[in-house]
Amino acid sequence: MKKNLITSVLMTVVTTVLLGLVYPLLITGLAQVFFKDKANGQIISANGHAIGSRIIGQPFTGPAYFHSRPSAAGNGYDASNSGGTNLGPTNQKLVDRVKQDVSALQPEANGKPIPVDMITTSASGLDPHVTPANAEFQVARVARERGMSETQLRQLVARHTEGRQVGFLGEPRVNVLELNLDLDGTQPMPTPR
């Protein structure tokens, strides 16, 4: 009995050290060597300050910016509250929110169909991407607010459209933060008069 107890305690200590200390440090070290940017959250900096992450969305509300899709992660892309809403398609709370979002987008739609990712959240609630259709839907508004041509803006969106991974995984997508940063660099907002 004493031998079994010693063996059990020893196994617990060994596995705790191996799996709780050695393995995480090894994986962290390998990630820092081979995937430094990805291991550190793919932070985007401007003027020496971190302004966001390439892999975590953030809200944009001004009319001169492309807007991200709605977030189910708390109050606007709160990473500590990540996750879907678990609201089913017949849940009245979800139905009311979608109706409200559709109503708010109707003036901008001008008869065009509203892309589904403009009114639905992603599984994590933190998705930094929108579909190319979502970006296209917003082109007229952003071009008008920035005082630039829709053609010029579509070229900018095309430059930021990422294809499928390995040619067949996922869907084409546009990173909203990167697009808006490039937009600010290409065509700063007009100064108010």
From Swiss-Prot:
Disulphide bridges, residue numbers: none
GO cellular component: plasma membrane
Subunit structure: The system is composed of three essential subunits: KdpA, KdpB and KdpC.
NCBIfam families: kdpC, PRK00315.1
Topology versus the membrane: Single-pass membrane protein
Gene Ontology molecular function, alphabetical: ATP binding; P-type potassium transmembrane transporter activity
Family: Belongs to the KdpC family.
Chief place of localization: membrane
Localization (cell): Cell inner membrane
Record gene name: kdpC
Record lineage: Bacteria, Pseudomonadati, Acidobacteriota, Terriglobia, Terriglobales
Descriptive protein name: Potassium-transporting ATPase KdpC subunit
Membrane-traversing stretches: 9-29
Keywords, comma-separated and alphabetical: ATP-binding, Cell inner membrane, Cell membrane, Ion transport, Membrane, Nucleotide-binding, Potassium, Potassium transport, Transmembrane, Transmembrane helix, Transport
Species for this entry: Koribacter versatilis (strain Ellin345)
Function recorded in the entry: Part of the high-affinity ATP-driven potassium transport (or Kdp) system, which catalyzes the hydrolysis of ATP coupled with the electrogenic transport of potassium into the cytoplasm. This subunit acts as a catalytic chaperone that increases the ATP-binding affinity of the ATP-hydrolyzing subunit KdpB by the formation of a transient KdpB/KdpC/ATP ternary complex.
